[in-house]
């Protein structure tokens, strides 16, 4: 059910209390404020009702479903959170309003994508945990999985990492950027996973990995410092037929520190 509460003021803290006939109660903090666009989902920084200590929303992802609706995905995170839960919200009015659709775990740093009319969620099972994939056959209401695609590599510090960047089709395969490592172990190495364009993403045997390339500070044009790294790749099929991995370049405290 939808309820309307009159006379709410911006930047004022409120507490919503729900009481059940059984005597059970649940309280959820919230506050109002101006945001551009439309709010898909909201979680108050102090609201830890459902997500341990994970309080913030991240890794946004969006697809248009075959039935015409929009499906948005995101995860919950914080420095002291469990980092393993993603949620999905649906809109049937071109993004003007959104409603909760489903929740899946373990799932973090995920990307929604369609392949031959099928809906998938490519993610990791937690911060630097195995790369996994889910499939939904009912437009995001329920999910099958997780299916493991890339485990941690024995003897190699860190683990799989990715961001909700796009997948690309090139040379008959579907490509997704993936990194390996962690901030704690000194940074990330860049790589990619792919499966045949006519294949089944839910079959791990059809996926292959390029291996991982460490960052090299001697490359031409790199920043100079002790904090330069790369991560969060985006696979792009270039007009000339090349496949390019555009990565975020972390160069804070380096020279130059931008650009």
Roles of regions detected by a PLM:
Residues 6-8, 12, 17-108, 113-163, ...:
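Beta-rich carbohydrate-recognition and catalytic domains
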């Amino acid at each position: 059910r939808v309820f309307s509460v009159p006379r709410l003021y911006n930047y004022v803290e409120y507490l919503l209390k729900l009481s059940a006939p059984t005597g059970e109660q649940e309280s959820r903090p919230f506050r109002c404020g101006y945001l551009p666009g439309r709010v898909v989902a909201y979680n108050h920084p102090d609201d830890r009702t459902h997500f341990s200590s994970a309080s913030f929303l991240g890794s946004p992802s969006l697809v248009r479903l075959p039935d015409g609706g929009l499906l948005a995905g995101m995860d919950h995170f914080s420095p002291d959170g469990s980092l393993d839960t993603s949620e999905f919200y649906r809109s049937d009015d071109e993004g003007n309003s959104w409603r909760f659709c489903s929740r899946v775990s373990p799932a973090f740093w995920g990307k929604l994508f369609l392949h031959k009319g099928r809906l998938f969620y490519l993610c990791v099972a937690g911060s630097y945990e195995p790369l996994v994939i889910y499939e939904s056959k009912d437009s995001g209401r329920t999910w099958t999985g997780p299916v493991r695609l890339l485990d941690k590599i024995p003897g190699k510090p860190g683990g799989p990492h990715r961001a909700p960047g796009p997948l690309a089709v090139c040379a008959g395969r579907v490509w997704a950027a993936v990194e390996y490592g962690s901030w704690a172990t000194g940074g990330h190495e860049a790589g990619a996973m792919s499966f045949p364009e006519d294949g089944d993403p839910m079959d791990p045997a059809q996926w292959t990995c390029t291996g991982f390339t460490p960052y090299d500070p001697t490359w031409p044009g790199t920043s100079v410092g002790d904090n330069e790294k790369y991560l969060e790749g985006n696979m792009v099929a270039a007009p000339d037929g090349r496949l390019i991995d555009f990565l975020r370049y972390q160069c804070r405290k380096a020279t130059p520190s931008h650009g």
